[in-house]
Amino acid sequence: MDPNTVSSFQDILMRMSKMQLESSSEDLNGMITQFESLKLYRDSLGEAVMRMGDLHSLQNRNGKWREQLGQKFEEIRWLIEEVRHRLKITENSFEQITFMQALQLLFEVEQEIRTFSFQLI
């Protein structure tokens, strides 16, 4: 796991939490929850790759891991679209920077998950 990605996740979540305090947007709450879920999934997949040979454990624990992987990619695509939309409509520079960083992070995480999944297949 790239330490920069981990700190990026923490930074984005902290920034979104600050934005959440200033707004009552349920969409933002959902985005934060999905970011947290995505981070946990990415971390667990990365740990499985690091333990190589853990594929059988992963498959036994979750026989539908490929389906789950597909769902995570759908979540990432949804988050990318949601972040792009937010970026277009916000005029607040703090929010713009946060959403630009979140977008970059999503692209990086999508690539990492693809790399991890190819190593597990």
Swiss-Prot record:
Transmembrane segments: none annotated. One of its GO terms (cellular component) is host cell nucleus. One of its GO terms (biological process) is exit of virus from host cell nucleus through nuclear pore. The keyword Cytoplasm does not apply. Its main location: virion. Pfam families: Flu_NS2. Signal peptide: none annotated. InterPro entries: Flu_NS2 (IPR000968). Keywords: Host nucleus, Host-virus interaction, Transport, Virion. A motif (Nuclear export signal) lies at residues 12-21, 85-94. SUPFAM superfamilies: Nonstructural protein ns2, Nep, M1-binding domain. It is found in: Virion; Host nucleus. The keyword Transport applies. Mediates the nuclear export of encapsidated genomic RNAs (ribonucleoproteins, RNPs). Acts as an adapter between viral RNPs complexes and the nuclear export machinery of the cell. Possesses no intrinsic RNA-binding activity, but includes a C-terminal M1-binding domain. This domain is believed to allow recognition of RNPs bound to the protein M1. Interacts with protein M1. May interact with host nucleoporin RAB/HRB and exportin XPO1/CRM1. Belongs to the influenza viruses NEP family. Average number present in a viral particle is estimated to be 130-200 molecules. This is Nuclear export protein. The lineage of its organism: Viruses, Riboviria, Orthornavirae, Negarnaviricota, Polyploviricotina. The gene is NS.
